[in-house]
Amino acid sequence: MNDSLSINQKPVIRCESVYKIFGTNANKLLEKASGPISAEEFQKAGCIIGVNDASFEIHKGEMLVVMGLSGSGKSTLLRCISRLTDPTSGEIFIDGENLLEMNSKQLIELRRNKMGMVFQSFALLPHKTVLENIAFPLIIKGLPTEESIKKAMEMVDLVGLKGRENYFPRELSGGQQQRVGIARSLAVEPDIWFLDEPFSALDPLIRKEMQDEFLRLQASLHKTIMFVTHDFDEALRLADRIAIMKDGIIEQLDTPDNIVLNPATEYVKKFTEDVPREKVLKIESIMDKYDQSLAGSNTVSKDAIIETVAESILDSKENLTVIDVNNDNKPIGILQPKKVITVLFGK
């Protein structure tokens, strides 16, 4: 979890009661809507739902992963937030500005200067080299060619493609092509990064490698990110918070730990049942409030994944003191070894 996030921050992205409905009777449906519209009402109206009353915020430096199966509305929601498609109803604000009130010129400027986008299809220009593909949006933006190439070379280094800058897309692997796509989207130094299933076309080993690369980039760049995936394990691995969608509705929006420990609906619970909790949960999610009288002499970081410290926890004959290593090792909680066993094994 990004510790810099604060509920007191003004959100970078704010979404209020967003609907995307396909069909000629969409406006009639919305006349009576005060919340999610039922499947029966959609069927009667002959409409198809894309997004059904979505409201949420994304704060600066946060990675919100929108997860759902095919047809859940996750990609439609991203397209509405980036205004690649217009929502049927609702409000969307980017840094306090109403996205839906912007004209075409303002939208182009916003996308050129504030937004980066990466999609499942690499969409590279086949007749241009890696360097030329990355420099392309900078040249379109109006930067001199020499400056664009210099910046593109920095991006080549950033994503680990040094030595391949003069290759053509056909000479690269799928993972390398997606690195070019990522570099191209970062070249304009966007504040907001939209990624729609960027790794789903890659084989499992390359996918894991790209997830590692993505986390490395985010640790240094601190972008505000909306990331779409159908893979719950990927969502757990990458997200600060996860929004799980079904039939256009956000079923639950919470931290990965809270979703695993406290699924809000039966639908969400199905995703969490087979999750190896020890590989996902952080100590902070299962600790008790700090009480000096119960504190033990051994300490454990609040951000540690249970699996990485399980042996020392289970060998301990006393409680452990949970500390915040980013705040001078301040004690913030108590961890009972018995509670770890209960959380992991239900005993």
Predicted segments with their positions:
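Conserved ABC ATPase "signature" region
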Residues: 14, 31-40, 97-98, 139, ...
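Helix-to-loop junction immediately C-terminal to a conserved catalytic motif
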Residues: 82
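Conserved ABC ATPase signature
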Residues: 168-172, 176
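Conserved ABC ATPase "signature" C-loop
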Residues: 247-248
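ABC ATPase "signature
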Residues: 253-254, 262, 334
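The conserved cystathionine-beta-synthase
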Residues: 295-327, 331-347
